[in-house]
């Protein structure tokens, strides 16, 4: 099938690779290169970089709303467009251009967690499961009817990165099945009950308040890892906490009990992966070997 692919970040790359292996990808749309790194040089998105390796034509318009861009899109003669974490809203002329419409791969169990950060929000909220939905796109934000859905359990120590990688592969597999069965699938309207929105993660959400219960802090650490990374002040430095587990122990909120077990308002968490400023992430034992933290030290919000 002639496919236009629209995506930008790492999450989208396995989907592009799967489509390229099984269909004719006539063009790839992604966000334009942006300044990144210490030199602030323009860096292409992961999708653009992979598309160019595969020899696929790439376009990165700043908007899809101009008549010229819409005419160019329609001229591709795509049978279907596949959209995953693209980064631009698709206006109606774009949605109408492919013969079979536009299919979106969304990383939640719709209608729960429509919007920009569904993986983060599922962990932060303490959800037991999440998944992938293949949706027929319409003008609303993630409101279209669902063609296919698959669930996955959220483990007690799963981070955003863990779910990101699992769901990305799941999305690549499901979209191939959806395209193959497109003539037989019956779009199911999303229920009106249970709608929630996954707002973008704000920087203010990353600072840890140790007076909160351990279960909440555990979800905060896992639900913000690796980006933006929940942080605390520890040993006079700002430290990102990237992996953890619930632990036994009591003490003053923020008190270092043993190793990297830190007391919370109720209960405690054990940090298993942490990152000092300017350093790479380190497992607990390696982190402690290079950072003297006496028992009773306090982790604080500022």
Curated annotation (Swiss-Prot):
Which positions bind (6S)-5,6,7,8-tetrahydrofolate? Answer: 108-111
Q: Give the record's keywords alphabetically.
A: Protein biosynthesis, Transferase
- Spell out the reaction equation it catalyses: L-methionyl-tRNA(fMet) + (6R)-10-formyltetrahydrofolate = N-formyl-L-methionyl-tRNA(fMet) + (6S)-5,6,7,8-tetrahydrofolate + H(+)
Q: What is its EC number?
A: 2.1.2.9
Q: Which CDD domains match?
A: FMT_core_Met-tRNA-FMT_N, Met_tRNA_FMT_C
Disulfide bridges in this chain: none
Q: Which GO terms describe its molecular function?
A: methionyl-tRNA formyltransferase activity
Task: Choose one Gene Ontology CC annotation of this protein and give it.
Answer: cytosol
Supply the enzyme class, top level. Answer: transferase
What family is this?
Belongs to the Fmt family.
Q: What NCBIfam families does the database record attribute to this sequence?
A: fmt
* Record-linked HAMAP family: Formyl_trans (MF_00182)
Role description: Attaches a formyl group to the free amino group of methionyl-tRNA(fMet). The formyl group appears to play a dual role in the initiator identity of N-formylmethionyl-tRNA by promoting its recognition by IF2 and preventing the misappropriation of this tRNA by the elongation apparatus.
Question: What name does this protein carry?
Answer: Methionyl-tRNA formyltransferase
**Native species:** Cereibacter sphaeroides (strain ATCC 17025 / ATH 2.4.3)
The gene designation is fmt
